[in-house]
Amino acid sequence: MEKYERIRVVGRGAFGIVHLCLRKADQKLVILKQIPVEQMTKEERQAAQNECQVLKLLNHPNVIEYYENFLEDKALMIAMEYAPGGTLAEFIQKRCNSLLEEETILHFFVQILLALHHVHTHLILHRDLKTQNILLDKHRMVVKIGDFGISKILSSKSKAYTVVGTPCYISPELCEGKPYNQKSDIWALGCVLYELASLKRAFEAANLPALVLKIMSGTFAPISDRYSPELRQLVLSLLSLEPAQRPPLSHIMAQPLCIRALLNIHTDVGSVRMRRAEKSLTPGPPIASGSTGSRATSARCRGVPRGPVRPAIPPPLSSVYAWGGGLSSPLRLPMLNTEVVQVAAGRTQKAGVTRSGRLILWEAPPLGAGGGTLLPGAVELPQPQFVSRFLEGQSGVTIKHVACGDLFTACLTDRGIIMTFGSGSNGCLGHGNLTDISQPTIVEALLGYEMVQVACGASHVLALSTDGELFAWGRGDGGRLGLGTRESHNCPQQVPVAPGQEAQRVVCGIDSSMILTSPGRVLACGSNRFNKLGLDHLSLDEEPVPYQQVEEALSFTPLGSAPLDQEPLLCVDLGTAHSAAITASGDCYTFGSNQHGQLGTSSRRVSRAPCRVQGLEGIKMVMVACGDAFTVAVGAEGEVYSWGKGTRGRLGRRDEDAGLPRPVQLDETHPYMVTSVSCCHGNTLLAVRSVTDEPVPP
């Protein structure tokens, strides 16, 4: 097992435990079947050996790939391909009563057909073909058949006599005790096709005798007449009572119904969707970016390009801009010819996630690498430069979200696994110690949960699971972990949340935390200095008396300041001494300290009451991010505004402090939409994507 790292138990097979593991050599997720051979009967050991023998013979994209087998602690370990999309049975169950399109049914069916043809070509019977043994890739587009534990290799005999398989898929000849050959697998194939078309099994009954009676009589409900007569006839032929009347696989593949789907499999699966620049058929003036006609749900630009658009040069897939920390205007970061869909800023880190699931980092070049010295007579400091790189050693992992704290980073994979790296001070990495780690390492305490989001504060972390379970770790003073104490923890702790408050999103600040719940309400904990969490119980424009001011909350508490406690909130973010929120109607509210104008009001008032940002009336806001003493907000049409403290480029322009929102100019010549924004201390990262008429793949 030195080559593998166990992640979690994902199931129990016919004869043993099934583990999801990480192969250390290439960081690829694999399945390890652990079969305790010493506790097995002779027949069971033969079945386990048979599975290895069968898997070694097969090599097909629609069959689960075999890697190796070895002995470990008196158990046979079989390493094989991991299919992250679950089983076809689970896919069908999630459809409820929503029937699949015929094209989708055939897309799945012909892949099963190809896999079974490959198996039969090697003189192997599957003998347990069912939707539970048909697996899907992560995009749920490619199917793979697996579980050959009871397969039979036909060496010299043409028929097998043992009765095995799942009862609902057993053929009539097996019910009669007759010998069978490949036609029994074709019966099971018909059962799978029927299940795809009707979302239920062809043969079901309360007990085994009743089930056998149904199978022997061939009694099953017809599939919906929304499907073509050819598909309905194919189901009937596959489920013929007489094995000789069931068509062989080669005949099924030759049917006109299947030919187009088979051609699509060979031409479309695995193809790379390309973007192309549309060339105008007739010369004409450039089209303004607001008149492209494309629609986007994210923040989208409506301005006119600064120059003529040259259709021969396609726009970049995306751009990431950075400002602050000495950058007085947005600097476009190098992109490595990829599309970044989400960004996160830390005290020193700049990170992003690409559409393909890779983690990209932007770093300052080492001293002496060029561009870092002034020429004689120069009066201005050179603009800082950055180099981009992909995080190495994660080739088998798909990242879907990243968050940054002070000198540490957390990332979330598409399988719901959280990995952390960087500084281990305050226990922020969640590994049960304070050790620094340079490479992303799995937070083992959360492997039993499927996580959907992670957020980092300066020195603490919140993580949310698919079932709404909340975990926190790191520094705990001020009650920022929401655990009811001020204690710190170097390992994830489950956070109690009041019943009915289903968490949808988590947010971390310097010394506080928030969770956004399903009805658009917000709970907060930690330091409430200046009422930056909105925990004071205030009516509109009311100021609390000193003894009513809430200075900190050790547990997650509903906001009490109007209108935050009344209007549904879509987005919230926490700065050092202030916070911001966007309501369902697109209004932006700020609360907390206004020392540097970060609340966006005309007067530098000293108030604990939330205020609506001035100057954004009539603009629907969709995103907001808070830095140490400034705020950045994004409108539905892609407008970017900033306000607050302006030193060291915090506002993305050469202004000093600005108490009211002003636009930030991005160097974009094509229509764009803002996909992500992140502020930390005095830095901002913002990602935009070019808007084209062609849809972007999910």
From Swiss-Prot:
- Which E.C. number(s) belong to this protein? 2.7.11.1
Residues that bind ATP, according to the entry? Answer: V10, G11, R12, G13, A14, F15, G16, I17, V18, K33
Q: Which Pfam families match?
A: Pkinase, WD40_RLD
What would changing H431Y do, according to UniProt? Shows a defect in ciliary localization with no apparent effect on ciliation, mitosis or centriole number
The cofactors required by this protein are: Mg(2+)
**Which residue range or ranges hold the Protein kinase domain?**
4-258
* RCC1 repeats (start-end): 416-467, 468-519, 520-585, 586-637, 638-690
The Gene Ontology biological process terms listed for this entry are: animal organ morphogenesis; determination of left/right symmetry; heart development; regulation of hippo signaling
At which residues is Phosphothreonine found? T162
Q: What InterPro entries does the entry give?
A: Kinase-like_dom_sf, Prot_kinase_dom, Protein_kinase_ATP_BS, RCC1/BLIP-II, Reg_chr_condens, Ser/Thr_kinase_AS, STK_NEK, STKc_Nek8
Protein origin, superkingdom: Eukaryota
Q: Tell whether Iron-sulfur is among the UniProt keywords.
A: no
**Localisation:** Cytoplasm; Cytoplasm, Cytoskeleton; Cell projection, Cilium; Cytoplasm, Cytoskeleton, Microtubule organizing center, Centrosome
Comp. bias (Low complexity): 288-309
Active-site residues are: D128
Q: What is the effect of changing L336F?
A: Shows a defect in ciliary localization with no apparent effect on ciliation, mitosis or centriole number
Q: Which GO terms describe its cellular component?
A: centrosome; ciliary base; ciliary inversin compartment; cilium; cytoplasm
Q: Which tissues show it? A: Kidney, liver, and testis.
The record describes the protein's role as: Required for renal tubular integrity. May regulate local cytoskeletal structure in kidney tubule epithelial cells. May regulate ciliary biogenesis through targeting of proteins to the cilia. Plays a role in organogenesis and is involved in the regulation of the Hippo signaling pathway.
PANTHER family in the cross-refs: PROTEIN CBG16200, SERINE_THREONINE-PROTEIN KINASE NEK8
Assembly and oligomerization: Interacts with PKD2; may regulate PKD2 targeting to the cilium. Interacts with ANKS6. Component of a complex containing at least ANKS6, INVS, NEK8 and NPHP3. ANKS6 may organize complex assembly by linking INVS and NPHP3 to NEK8 and INVS may target the complex to the proximal ciliary axoneme. Interacts with ANKS3.
Q: Which family does this protein fall into?
A: Belongs to the protein kinase superfamily. NEK Ser/Thr protein kinase family. NIMA subfamily.
> What is the designated name of this protein?
Serine/threonine-protein kinase Nek8
Taxonomy of the source species? Eukaryota, Metazoa, Chordata, Craniata, Vertebrata
The gene name on file is Nek8
